[in-house]
Amino acid sequence: MVPVRGQITAFRCSQNPTKTIWRTLATAEPPKPKRKRTMFTDKLNQGPSFADFVSGKASNMTIDPLEAARQDPDQRLPSWLKVPIPKGKSFHTLKKDVRELKLATVCEEAKCPNIGECWGGKKSEATATIMLMGDTCTRGCRFCSVKTSRKPAPPDPMEPENTAEAISRWGLGYVVLTTVDRDDLVDGGAHHLAETVRKIKEKAPQILVEVLGGDFRGDLDMASVLARSGLDVYAHNIETVEDLTPHVRDRRATYRQSLSILQRAKETKPSLVTKTSMMLGFGETDEQIMQTLRDLREIKCDVVTFGQYMRPTKRHMKVVEYVTPEKFDYWRDTALKMGFLYVASGPLVRSSYKAGEAFIENVIRKRNHNVGETPRLESASAAQL
């Protein structure tokens, strides 16, 4: 018989078999393991006590630090960052086209504030940024609102063909292709992107194609694969200054690695326009920005854009500073003096902001010039934006 806890059980004495010993088993349960502290517990401990409620001091106290950040005047948007709600016939037509053609755009996924402006004009002048290889990234940068996963769904092998067919029927003059980081793929998705570019050029050679790619985990050969695909603009964003990179970007993305990708693209095809983008407002200094511009010119990067970092959700990095339009104008002028061919700089500028409008005329002029001559591009200022 197996003794049961809490029952009175009889045992035979080993020294005297005729003697019976009655013993009650312990009824106390073994101690349960302590529960781990939770974030909710921490928030309660940081918040008002019972004495605060009794004294009436709790009315002005906030338990959630995120709520405190929301109420912080420094986190409120200044007037120059407020944009009207997207509307108009052209905007809704393009949005409908995106749904019917089953295209995923970073304009919508990343909550771009310029979607109404970029999609609001004529279709031939519109710029759309198409997201390839899914909407889930293998990295988790602290500024980005795109979904993350260690193992996203595999890329659709028919995506290059389907995307090219949809874009060729869409009627755009300029298209930007971008992608989430796919560290789960051996080549980082480089061949998938290159095949998409080739398919687009086969079906609609008049369309100018910009690719905003990742760093392929530093695999420079993959940067060469993409550079040779037939694209017109090779873009890779450096995002921020070197000192802040570990705090802003995923640990697998480094400042020097991004520079090497842009450099390899230019070395692979010197006539290729290379482009990068920086966000301001993370707490960077003027000297740090200047050093970044020097580094970019050293690798012969052609185009740079500056925009304001805007916190997508309360789970992301807080904005340290809202940079004024005048300061964006200063960086535009500074970059042009340093030799950049084109600079877009303004609070609402994003890496693909009106890319077609800025580049179509320039690419035509470059192709009409003699080999070795590089025409200077006009710049987009904060005032124009």
Curated annotation (Swiss-Prot):
PROSITE patterns found in the cross-reference section: RADICAL_SAM
Cysteine disulfide links: none
Binding site for [4Fe-4S] cluster 1: C107, C112, C118, S352
Enzyme class: transferase
Cellular component GO terms held in the UniProt record: mitochondrion
Family statement: Belongs to the radical SAM superfamily. Lipoyl synthase family.
Protein name: Lipoyl synthase, mitochondrial
Species: Meyerozyma guilliermondii (strain ATCC 6260 / CBS 566 / DSM 6381 / JCM 1539 / NBRC 10279 / NRRL Y-324)
